[in-house]
Amino acid sequence: MNRMSNTVIGFLNILTLISSIVLLGSALWMGRSKTTCEHFLQKPLLILGLAILILSVAGLVGACCDVAWVLWVYLFFMVFIIVALMGLTLFGFIVTSHSGGVVVDGRVYKEFKLEAYHPWLKTRVVDTNYWVTIKTCLLGSVTCSKLALWTPLDYLQKDLSPLQSGCCKPPTSCVYNTDTVIQQDPDCYRWNNAATVLCYDCDTCRAGVLETVRRDWHKLSLVNVIVVIFLIAVYCVGCCAFKNAKRPQHYGFPYGRYGMSKSRPGWEQSWSRWWHGRDRY
Protein backbone atom coordinates (compact mmCIF):
# COMPACT_ATOMS: atom_id res chain seq x y z
CA MET A 1 0.00 0.00 0.00
CA ASN A 2 2.91 2.30 0.79
CA ARG A 3 4.29 1.92 -2.72
CA MET A 4 0.89 2.33 -4.36
CA SER A 5 1.02 6.14 -4.45
CA ASN A 6 4.57 6.02 -5.85
CA THR A 7 3.44 3.68 -8.61
CA VAL A 8 0.42 5.84 -9.42
CA ILE A 9 2.44 9.07 -9.48
CA GLY A 10 4.98 7.39 -11.76
CA PHE A 11 2.27 6.27 -14.17
CA LEU A 12 0.58 9.68 -14.15
CA ASN A 13 3.88 11.42 -14.82
CA ILE A 14 4.44 9.19 -17.83
CA LEU A 15 1.11 10.48 -19.17
CA THR A 16 2.06 14.10 -18.45
CA LEU A 17 5.45 13.50 -20.10
CA ILE A 18 3.72 12.31 -23.27
CA SER A 19 1.34 15.30 -23.09
CA SER A 20 4.25 17.73 -22.79
CA ILE A 21 5.88 16.24 -25.89
CA VAL A 22 2.60 16.68 -27.78
CA LEU A 23 2.41 20.33 -26.64
CA LEU A 24 5.98 21.02 -27.72
CA GLY A 25 5.34 19.35 -31.07
CA SER A 26 2.21 21.44 -31.61
CA ALA A 27 4.07 24.66 -30.81
CA LEU A 28 6.92 23.80 -33.18
CA TRP A 29 4.42 22.88 -35.89
CA MET A 30 2.75 26.28 -35.51
CA GLY A 31 6.07 27.97 -36.11
CA ARG A 32 6.89 26.00 -39.26
CA SER A 33 3.48 25.37 -40.80
CA LYS A 34 2.67 27.18 -44.04
CA THR A 35 -1.08 26.90 -43.51
CA THR A 36 -1.33 28.78 -40.22
CA CYS A 37 -0.04 32.18 -39.14
CA GLU A 38 -0.94 31.96 -35.48
CA HIS A 39 1.93 33.13 -33.32
CA PHE A 40 -0.20 34.13 -30.33
CA LEU A 41 -0.26 30.62 -28.89
CA GLN A 42 3.19 29.42 -29.93
CA LYS A 43 5.22 30.85 -27.04
CA PRO A 44 2.68 29.92 -24.30
CA LEU A 45 2.57 26.36 -25.64
CA LEU A 46 6.37 26.13 -25.73
CA ILE A 47 6.75 27.43 -22.17
CA LEU A 48 3.93 25.25 -20.82
CA GLY A 49 5.15 22.13 -22.62
CA LEU A 50 8.75 22.61 -21.44
CA ALA A 51 7.68 23.24 -17.83
CA ILE A 52 5.47 20.15 -17.74
CA LEU A 53 8.25 18.09 -19.36
CA ILE A 54 10.77 19.07 -16.66
CA LEU A 55 8.25 18.50 -13.87
CA SER A 56 7.28 15.09 -15.26
CA VAL A 57 10.90 13.94 -15.29
CA ALA A 58 11.38 15.22 -11.73
CA GLY A 59 8.22 13.44 -10.61
CA LEU A 60 9.34 10.16 -12.19
CA VAL A 61 12.77 10.34 -10.55
CA GLY A 62 11.34 11.25 -7.16
CA ALA A 63 8.61 8.59 -7.19
CA CYS A 64 10.64 5.71 -8.64
CA CYS A 65 13.77 6.34 -6.55
CA ASP A 66 12.02 7.55 -3.36
CA VAL A 67 14.04 10.78 -3.38
CA ALA A 68 12.16 13.06 -1.00
CA TRP A 69 13.86 16.36 -1.89
CA VAL A 70 13.18 15.85 -5.61
CA LEU A 71 9.50 15.23 -4.86
CA TRP A 72 9.45 18.35 -2.67
CA VAL A 73 10.81 20.47 -5.53
CA TYR A 74 8.35 18.75 -7.89
CA LEU A 75 5.35 19.56 -5.67
CA PHE A 76 6.58 23.11 -5.02
CA PHE A 77 6.74 24.00 -8.70
CA MET A 78 3.61 22.02 -9.49
CA VAL A 79 1.64 24.53 -7.41
CA PHE A 80 2.94 27.39 -9.58
CA ILE A 81 2.13 25.47 -12.77
CA ILE A 82 -1.44 24.83 -11.61
CA VAL A 83 -2.00 28.44 -10.54
CA ALA A 84 -0.45 29.82 -13.75
CA LEU A 85 -2.51 27.47 -15.90
CA MET A 86 -5.70 28.43 -14.07
CA GLY A 87 -4.90 32.11 -14.62
CA LEU A 88 -4.11 31.54 -18.30
CA THR A 89 -7.35 29.59 -18.73
CA LEU A 90 -9.45 32.28 -17.07
CA PHE A 91 -7.74 34.99 -19.14
CA GLY A 92 -8.34 32.94 -22.28
CA PHE A 93 -12.07 32.67 -21.60
CA ILE A 94 -12.30 36.43 -20.96
CA VAL A 95 -10.36 37.42 -24.08
CA THR A 96 -12.14 34.98 -26.40
CA SER A 97 -15.67 35.52 -25.11
CA HIS A 98 -16.75 37.84 -27.96
CA SER A 99 -16.68 37.19 -31.69
CA GLY A 100 -16.67 39.89 -34.34
CA GLY A 101 -18.57 37.81 -36.88
CA VAL A 102 -21.40 39.53 -38.77
CA VAL A 103 -23.88 37.67 -40.98
CA VAL A 104 -23.86 38.85 -44.62
CA ASP A 105 -27.21 38.76 -46.43
CA GLY A 106 -27.27 36.22 -49.23
CA ARG A 107 -23.91 34.73 -48.25
CA VAL A 108 -22.91 31.58 -46.39
CA TYR A 109 -19.80 33.13 -44.87
CA LYS A 110 -19.47 35.84 -42.23
CA GLU A 111 -17.45 39.03 -42.23
CA PHE A 112 -15.57 40.15 -39.14
CA LYS A 113 -15.28 43.57 -37.50
CA LEU A 114 -12.06 44.52 -35.72
CA GLU A 115 -13.75 46.78 -33.16
CA ALA A 116 -15.78 43.87 -31.75
CA TYR A 117 -12.77 42.04 -30.30
CA HIS A 118 -11.15 42.35 -26.90
CA PRO A 119 -8.80 45.38 -26.61
CA TRP A 120 -5.84 43.18 -25.66
CA LEU A 121 -6.17 41.24 -28.91
CA LYS A 122 -6.61 44.38 -30.98
CA THR A 123 -3.42 45.96 -29.67
CA ARG A 124 -1.46 43.01 -31.03
CA VAL A 125 -2.62 43.24 -34.64
CA VAL A 126 -2.63 47.05 -34.66
CA ASP A 127 1.10 47.01 -33.88
CA THR A 128 2.87 47.62 -37.20
CA ASN A 129 5.90 45.42 -36.53
CA TYR A 130 3.78 42.48 -35.47
CA TRP A 131 1.43 42.87 -38.42
CA VAL A 132 4.32 42.82 -40.89
CA THR A 133 5.21 39.36 -39.54
CA ILE A 134 1.62 38.15 -39.88
CA LYS A 135 1.29 39.65 -43.36
CA THR A 136 4.49 37.98 -44.53
CA CYS A 137 3.21 34.66 -43.26
CA LEU A 138 -0.13 35.13 -45.03
CA LEU A 139 1.61 35.95 -48.30
CA GLY A 140 3.61 32.74 -48.05
CA SER A 141 0.57 30.61 -47.29
CA VAL A 142 -2.10 29.18 -49.58
CA THR A 143 -4.91 31.05 -47.85
CA CYS A 144 -5.98 33.18 -50.81
CA SER A 145 -4.65 31.12 -53.70
CA LYS A 146 -7.55 28.70 -53.30
CA LEU A 147 -9.99 31.46 -54.27
CA ALA A 148 -8.23 32.43 -57.50
CA LEU A 149 -10.49 30.21 -59.63
CA TRP A 150 -13.74 31.01 -57.83
CA THR A 151 -16.66 32.41 -59.82
CA PRO A 152 -19.17 34.97 -58.46
CA LEU A 153 -21.56 32.06 -57.90
CA ASP A 154 -19.02 30.35 -55.66
CA TYR A 155 -18.98 33.39 -53.38
CA LEU A 156 -22.74 33.04 -53.02
CA GLN A 157 -22.81 29.32 -52.30
CA LYS A 158 -19.54 28.46 -50.53
CA ASP A 159 -18.27 29.22 -47.06
CA LEU A 160 -15.05 31.08 -46.30
CA SER A 161 -12.65 30.83 -43.40
CA PRO A 162 -12.16 33.99 -41.32
CA LEU A 163 -8.81 34.62 -43.02
CA GLN A 164 -10.25 34.16 -46.50
CA SER A 165 -13.23 36.36 -45.71
CA GLY A 166 -11.11 39.20 -44.35
CA CYS A 167 -7.87 39.05 -46.34
CA CYS A 168 -8.71 37.66 -49.78
CA LYS A 169 -11.58 39.89 -50.87
CA PRO A 170 -12.97 43.38 -50.23
CA PRO A 171 -15.95 43.82 -47.90
CA THR A 172 -19.21 42.74 -49.53
CA SER A 173 -20.64 46.24 -49.11
CA CYS A 174 -18.01 47.79 -51.40
CA VAL A 175 -19.24 49.21 -54.71
CA TYR A 176 -16.73 49.76 -57.54
CA ASN A 177 -18.84 50.05 -60.71
CA THR A 178 -20.23 53.51 -60.12
CA ASP A 179 -19.21 56.96 -61.27
CA THR A 180 -20.64 58.74 -58.26
CA VAL A 181 -18.60 59.23 -55.13
CA ILE A 182 -20.21 57.50 -52.16
CA GLN A 183 -19.15 56.99 -48.58
CA GLN A 184 -17.73 53.50 -48.18
CA ASP A 185 -15.85 51.36 -45.71
CA PRO A 186 -12.15 52.45 -45.63
CA ASP A 187 -11.21 48.85 -46.43
CA CYS A 188 -12.84 49.29 -49.83
CA TYR A 189 -10.05 51.70 -50.77
CA ARG A 190 -7.32 49.44 -49.36
CA TRP A 191 -8.33 46.57 -51.64
CA ASN A 192 -6.25 45.80 -54.73
CA ASN A 193 -6.43 42.91 -57.20
CA ALA A 194 -2.67 42.34 -57.05
CA ALA A 195 -1.92 38.98 -55.43
CA THR A 196 0.63 40.58 -53.10
CA VAL A 197 -1.80 43.27 -51.93
CA LEU A 198 -5.43 42.07 -51.96
CA CYS A 199 -6.87 43.12 -48.59
CA TYR A 200 -3.89 42.22 -46.41
CA ASP A 201 -3.78 45.75 -44.98
CA CYS A 202 -7.51 45.86 -44.29
CA ASP A 203 -9.02 45.90 -40.83
CA THR A 204 -11.14 42.94 -41.93
CA CYS A 205 -7.95 40.94 -42.45
CA ARG A 206 -6.78 41.79 -38.94
CA ALA A 207 -10.20 40.77 -37.67
CA GLY A 208 -9.93 37.48 -39.58
CA VAL A 209 -6.62 36.74 -37.88
CA LEU A 210 -8.13 37.53 -34.47
CA GLU A 211 -11.14 35.32 -35.15
CA THR A 212 -8.87 32.41 -36.04
CA VAL A 213 -6.85 32.98 -32.87
CA ARG A 214 -10.03 33.38 -30.81
CA ARG A 215 -11.46 30.05 -31.95
CA ASP A 216 -8.27 28.11 -31.35
CA TRP A 217 -7.57 29.81 -28.02
CA HIS A 218 -11.12 29.06 -26.84
CA LYS A 219 -10.62 25.37 -27.67
CA LEU A 220 -7.27 25.43 -25.88
CA SER A 221 -8.92 26.96 -22.78
CA LEU A 222 -11.43 24.10 -22.70
CA VAL A 223 -8.56 21.62 -22.86
CA ASN A 224 -6.75 23.54 -20.11
CA VAL A 225 -9.69 22.97 -17.76
CA ILE A 226 -9.19 19.21 -18.13
CA VAL A 227 -5.42 19.61 -17.73
CA VAL A 228 -5.85 21.62 -14.50
CA ILE A 229 -8.13 18.94 -13.02
CA PHE A 230 -5.63 16.26 -14.02
CA LEU A 231 -2.67 18.17 -12.52
CA ILE A 232 -4.55 18.69 -9.25
CA ALA A 233 -5.10 14.92 -9.06
CA VAL A 234 -1.41 14.34 -9.80
CA TYR A 235 -0.47 16.84 -7.09
CA CYS A 236 -2.61 15.05 -4.48
CA VAL A 237 -1.06 11.69 -5.31
CA GLY A 238 2.36 13.33 -5.33
CA CYS A 239 1.83 14.49 -1.74
CA CYS A 240 1.26 10.87 -0.70
CA ALA A 241 4.38 9.78 -2.57
CA PHE A 242 6.36 12.53 -0.83
CA LYS A 243 5.24 11.29 2.60
CA ASN A 244 6.25 7.73 1.71
CA ALA A 245 9.66 8.87 0.47
CA LYS A 246 10.22 11.09 3.51
CA ARG A 247 9.33 8.49 6.17
CA PRO A 248 12.26 6.05 5.77
CA GLN A 249 14.76 8.91 5.51
CA HIS A 250 13.75 10.45 8.83
CA TYR A 251 12.70 7.45 10.88
CA GLY A 252 14.94 4.66 9.68
CA PHE A 253 12.66 1.60 9.73
CA PRO A 254 9.28 2.99 10.78
CA TYR A 255 7.58 -0.41 10.63
CA GLY A 256 10.45 -2.46 12.03
CA ARG A 257 13.42 -3.95 10.24
CA TYR A 258 11.28 -6.72 8.78
CA GLY A 259 8.32 -4.53 7.90
CA MET A 260 6.25 -5.28 11.07
CA SER A 261 5.37 -2.73 13.70
CA LYS A 262 6.53 -3.34 17.27
CA SER A 263 4.30 -1.88 19.96
CA ARG A 264 5.57 -0.73 23.35
CA PRO A 265 4.12 -2.51 26.41
CA GLY A 266 1.26 -0.73 28.13
CA TRP A 267 0.81 -0.11 31.86
CA GLU A 268 -1.43 -3.14 32.31
CA GLN A 269 1.26 -5.45 30.91
CA SER A 270 3.91 -3.94 33.20
CA TRP A 271 1.63 -4.24 36.23
CA SER A 272 0.76 -7.86 35.44
CA ARG A 273 4.45 -8.75 35.05
CA TRP A 274 5.27 -7.13 38.43
CA TRP A 275 2.34 -8.82 40.21
CA HIS A 276 3.18 -12.33 39.02
CA GLY A 277 6.90 -11.90 39.70
CA ARG A 278 6.70 -10.52 43.29
CA ASP A 279 6.43 -14.05 44.88
CA ARG A 280 9.86 -14.94 43.54
CA TYR A 281 11.53 -12.61 46.02
Swiss-Prot record:
Protein name: Tetraspanin-5
Keyword Membrane: yes
Record keywords: Membrane, Transmembrane, Transmembrane helix
Listed GO CC annotations: membrane
GO terms under biological process: auxin-activated signaling pathway; organ growth
Cellular location(s): Membrane
Topological category with respect to the lipid bilayer: Multi-pass membrane protein
Family under the similarity heading: Belongs to the tetraspanin (TM4SF) family.
Cytoplasmic-facing ranges: 1-7, 66-74, 243-281
Extracellular side: 29-44, 96-221
Family matches, as Pfam families: Tetraspanin
Top-level taxonomic group: Eukaryota
Transmembrane segments: 8-28, 45-65, 75-95, 222-242
Main function: May be involved in the regulation of cell differentiation.
Keyword Membrane annotated: yes
